[in-house]
């Protein structure tokens, strides 16, 4: 059912997303579809085109460009249109104010943040992925003490370098239950990680003694610098165990007095949106979004916003797409997200829970104002 509230004129501050791939060989079939689902199972490619989200995305992008609403027609259009023209059209139509980019999800064939800003014509700010930074420091250090010292030093100058926030993917490295660890426990596990880095030139930080210790170090520095820390929560790529990614697993960190000054930003949250909303209602330093559910759940976007707002204050809900690699994801996130938010705000007005002015103010807050204040983004 169409909404009577039009949010298209409110520019979005996308507080969690990733960069785009640089132009290469034209994408076809499975190579294109893989960006529109979280699965890495190659046998799922044939099924992605039958998801409600993918079918809706094709129709929406086709309507914008005036082509037939089919995968074949869209891929032909992509191949025939200069990449910069194609991307700018989607970002303009999506009406984005600025992008906060997690730079830890980037390959050699991706744009850097400056290049991305030039391409899309919007400010692009940096979010540091903590695990990526930790892995680099492990590879570059001789002792574990050097890793800790280097991590603290990097985070103390992060804001001066233009970094606006931090991000953890602990959910992908064993779960969100971050336990207290001693320096001695972490140092004892360091040699094995260092040997892996020496042998292969890189290391994947999954040892929880080291990760848990360094995450607490990072949170201490975030508290001092007043840097928001994003946590991947709930669903995502298929290498995360959804059972250990419930946001309630973070409670020990949230109630720790040492971290009460750290803004915790819980990303995605689906299907634990109510649990995340509960935490945002309890703790002043907890914020949430429903990115990835917006847009992947398609018609479920309204339900995601509805569940988030059952308990969470409007001032605690942020907007993000979690889009990456291809510009269609950004456009779909903006379009479907605005529709879903407008529909729940419509309902709240119709049910005499909010008045029209309150609903419009809520939309402004969720789509950009809350994030601008939290991350200290001007304008």
Predicted regions and their residues:
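Conserved, mostly hydrophobic/aromatic
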Residues: 16, 99, 166, 232, ...
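Alpha-helical scaffold segments that flank or form the walls of functional sites
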Residues: 27-120, 126, 148-161
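H/E-rich (His + Asp/Glu) clusters that bind or coordinate divalent metals
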Residues: 254, 258-379
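Acidic (Asp/Glu)-rich catalytic clusters
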Residues: 89-93, 111-127, 154-162, 220-224, ...
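Mid-to-C-terminal alpha-helical segments outside catalytic/metal-binding sites
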Residues: 1-15, 27-64, 68, 72-78, ...
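Histidine-centered catalytic micro-motifs
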Residues: 11-24, 228-234
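Divalent metal-binding pocket/active-site signature
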Residues: 161-274
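A gly/proline- and charged-residue-enriched helix-loop-helix capping module
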Residues: 127-149
């Amino acid at each position: 059912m169409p909404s009577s509230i039009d949010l298209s004129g409110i520019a979005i501050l996308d507080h969690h997303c990733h960069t785009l791939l640089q132009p290469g060989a034209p994408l076809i079939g499975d190579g294109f579809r893989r960006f529109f689902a979280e699965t890495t199972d190659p046998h799922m490619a044939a099924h992605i085109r039958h998801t409600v989200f993918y079918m809706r995305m094709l129709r929406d992008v086709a309507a914008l460009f005036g082509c037939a609403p089919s995968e074949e027609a869209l891929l032909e259009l992509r191949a025939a249109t200069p990449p910069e023209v194609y991307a700018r059209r989607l970002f303009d139509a999506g009406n984005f104010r600025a992008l906060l980019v997690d730079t830890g999800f980037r390959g050699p064939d991706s744009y850097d943040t400056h290049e991305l800003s030039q391409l899309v014509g919007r400010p692009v700010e940096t979010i540091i992925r903590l695990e990526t930074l930790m892995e680099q420091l492990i590879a570059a250090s001789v002792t574990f003490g050097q890793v800790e010292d280097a991590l603290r030093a990097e985070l103390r100058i992060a804001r001066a370098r233009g970094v606006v926030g931090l991000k953890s993917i602990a959910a992908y490295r064993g779960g969100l239950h971050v336990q207290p660890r001693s320096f001695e426990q972490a140092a004892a596990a360091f040699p094995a990680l260092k040997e892996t880095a020496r042998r292969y030139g890189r290391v994947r930080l999954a040892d929880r003694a080291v990760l848990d210790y360094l995450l607490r170090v990072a949170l201490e520095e975030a508290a001092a610098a007043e840097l928001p820390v994003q946590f991947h929560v709930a669903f995502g790529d298929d290498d995360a165990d959804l059972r250990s990614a419930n946001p309630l697993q973070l409670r020990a960190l949230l109630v720790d007095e040492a971290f009460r000054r750290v803004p915790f930003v819980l990303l995605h949250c689906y299907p634990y949106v109510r649990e995340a909303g509960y935490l945002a209602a309890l703790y002043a330093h907890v914020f949430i979004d429903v990115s990835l559910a917006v847009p992947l759940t398609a018609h479920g976007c309204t339900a995601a916003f509805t569940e988030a707002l059952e308990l969470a204050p409007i001032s605690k809900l942020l907007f993000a797409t979690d889009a990456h690699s291809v510009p269609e994801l950004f456009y779909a996130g903006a379009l479907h997200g605005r529709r879903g938010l407008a529909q729940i705000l419509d309902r709240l007005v119709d049910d005499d829970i909010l008045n029209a002015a309150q609903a419009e103010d809520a939309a402004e807050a969720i789509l950009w104002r809350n994030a601008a204040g939290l991350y200290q983004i001007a304008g």
